[in-house]
Amino acid sequence: MSPLHFSFYSAFTFSSLGLAFHRTHLISALLCLESMMLSMFIPLSIWPVENQTPSFALVPILMLAFSACEAGTGLAMLVASARTHGSDHLHNLNLLQC
């Protein structure tokens, strides 16, 4: 495994561990999700160049568009929860409470 691939795998692993262990605030969970998306975006954008397959060149752009939609939805949830509950703690966002 090359050092470049190892760095991408470790970035994804560390951001998923951050999502698993630092789940106190919604903004920290959103940052971990965004770092996971970026750690997947960079190898996906390098892969068509290495393999010289231009048909897969649009896949990273599509993933980046979905990532932007996810970030916008997450920030809208952050603002809505801060307005209704007064904080962005994840333990306040229990769906079983009405």
Curated annotation (Swiss-Prot):
It catalyses: a ubiquinone + NADH + 5 H(+)(in) = a ubiquinol + NAD(+) + 4 H(+)(out). It is found in: Mitochondrion inner membrane. It is an enzyme of class 7 (translocase). Keywords: Electron transport, Membrane, Mitochondrion, Mitochondrion inner membrane, NAD, Respiratory chain, Translocase, Transmembrane, Transmembrane helix, Transport, Ubiquinone. It comes from the Eukaryota. Its EC number is 7.1.1.2. It holds the Pfam family Oxidored_q2. Core subunit of the mitochondrial membrane respiratory chain NADH dehydrogenase (Complex I) which catalyzes electron transfer from NADH through the respiratory chain, using ubiquinone as an electron acceptor. Part of the enzyme membrane arm which is embedded in the lipid bilayer and involved in proton translocation. Core subunit of respiratory chain NADH dehydrogenase (Complex I) which is composed of 45 different subunits. This is NADH-ubiquinone oxidoreductase chain 4L.
